[in-house]
Structures are given as structure tokens and as C-alpha cells.
Amino acid sequence: MTTAKTAQKQGQARRDQLRGQVLSIVEQQLRSGKTFAEINVADVVAEAGISRSTFYAYFVDKSTLLRIWYDEFTQVVLGAVQAWWSLDDTATSQDVRAALERIMDAYRAHPELLAATHEAIGNDHGVREAVDHAMRRYIDGLRTHIEAGQANGFIDPSLPAAETAYWLQWMAERGLHRMLREEPESSQKLLAEAYAAIVWNSLYAPARRSGG
């Protein structure tokens, strides 16, 4: 490995380590009741034991930090959601419930950062673009699954695939981040079961009843 590549690798490792450290502090402050807008860089770098210049050497501002995290989170969700989008004509309602649980597990890991992301949508163009891009990918993926299911007889053929995917994905996006941040565990279980029932009865159950 050349000296330049070694330095680049070390720089990326330092950036990743610093990002994890700073994000942990931001999450702690969010849990304490602060909004993302109320968190200032001076307090974060002081707690992290780094200088402001070090922070800004890696991140343009705190919103950049949030966008980088959200892009990584999107990849985690896209990995988890494959358990749903890979279901076929043998899938049961319990299979759907288990697949959706994997997605919910991804959201459960960082509810405060998700809430901060949605808070920032209103005033940060970059965050808004990151969320919109992620949602387009989620919607396109579900649309493809619906179309495949319709072609193979296990999803209701009367549904408009693109529009159905749009509604199901936006319902889940808003519902999941609010549920995991605001509802007690007992309510979360009931809400998760209701989510799975909505998906099953909207997409798969009609095809089963008609013998598809």
C-alpha cells in the first residue's frame, strides 16, 4: 500500500471514529430533551474533548453530520427490507410480520437521530434531499415487489402498484419514527401488529381469497 493510500485509510478511520463519538454525544443530548436545533457545536466538541477546528475539518456543520448518518441508516434499512421484498407466493401473514420486524429493529436503534432528521427537514435542504432520496428508493423497491407479486398471483392485481407503494412507505416512515420515540413498549407491540395486518390485508390477503 502506498503512503498516500495509507494516509487516506487512516484519515477515513479517524473520521469514522470521530463521527461515532460525536453522534453518541448528540444522541445523549437529544435523549435529555433538547431538540436538534438547540444542540450547539461548542457544547458537543467540549464534551468530545476536541477543538472546533477539528470538528469543522471533518464536517461542514452539524447538519452535515446528520446527513452522513442518515445516508448510512438508509443502507441499513435497505438491507433489512429485503426480507420483505423477497417474499413470494409461499409467504404467510407471520412471514410478513417477521419481515417487517426486521425493518422496525433498524428504526429502533436510533429513534432520537431519526426524530432529529425529520425535525431538520423543514429548514435544511440537504437533509430534506437525503430523506426524499431514501423515500424514492423505498417506494421504488416496494413498487417492484408489488408488481412482481401481481405478475405471480400473490398480490392483489387490482392495486395501482406505484401509488400503493407510496402510501404504504410514507405511512410507515412517519409512523415508525413517532411510535418508537413516543409510545410505551406495550403500545409499540400492538401498533407493530396493526402495521403488519395493514400490509397483509392490503397486499396479500385479497389474492389468497381469490385463489391467486
Regions found by a protein language model. Give the residues of each.
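Hydrophobic/aromatic-rich alpha-helical bundle segments in the mid-to-C-terminal region
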Residues: 128, 150-197, 206-212
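Helical hydrophobic small-molecule/effector-binding pocket
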Residues: 93-118, 140-144, 169, 204-209
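N-terminal intrinsically disordered/low-complexity leader segments
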Residues: 1-17, 158, 181, 207-212
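Hydrophobic alpha-helical connector segments
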Residues: 68, 82-109, 161, 168, ...
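Helix-turn-helix
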Residues: 21, 32-64, 68
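Amphipathic alpha-helical packing segments from all-alpha helical-bundle domains
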Residues: 79-82, 105-109, 125-152, 162-166, ...
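Short helix-capping/turn signature of helix-turn-helix
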Residues: 59, 119-123
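Generic hydrophobic, amphipathic alpha-helix propensity
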Residues: 14-29, 44, 69-77, 142
